[in-house]
């Protein structure tokens, strides 16, 4: 097994290489998924939907109900304070 012993702790070169290669594969998959998501947003926009509004909905759906309700209450409070409601 190849090891690097110049460091205070020995590092397995093979293990390090495996970690790096896994990260590289995952980064490539992440790029592919990101490209797929962009395509879906383009289709969505082409169908007449507002992509900005859909992004907001997706962001809100990731939150727990109580977090979402708290955020909406704070936004409403700020809008009221600024005379926007």
From Swiss-Prot:
Record-linked NCBIfam families: PRK13694.1
Listed InterPro entries: GapR-like (IPR018753), GapR-like_DNA-bd (IPR046367)
Single Gene Ontology MF annotation: DNA binding
Family: Belongs to the UPF0335 family.
Protein name per Swiss-Prot or TrEMBL: UPF0335 protein BQ12070
Superkingdom of this protein's organism: Bacteria
């Amino acid at each position: 097994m190849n090891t690097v012993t110049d460091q205070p702790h020995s590092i397995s070169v093979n293990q390090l290489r495996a970690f790096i290669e896994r990260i590289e594969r995952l980064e490539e998959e992440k790029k592919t998924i990101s490209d797929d998501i962009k395509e879906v947003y383009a289709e969505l926009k082409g169908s007449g939907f507002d992509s900005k509004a859909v992004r907001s909905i997706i962001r809100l759906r990731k939150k727990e109900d109580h977090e979402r309700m708290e955020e909406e209450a704070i936004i409403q409070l700020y809008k009221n304070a600024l005379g926007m409601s």
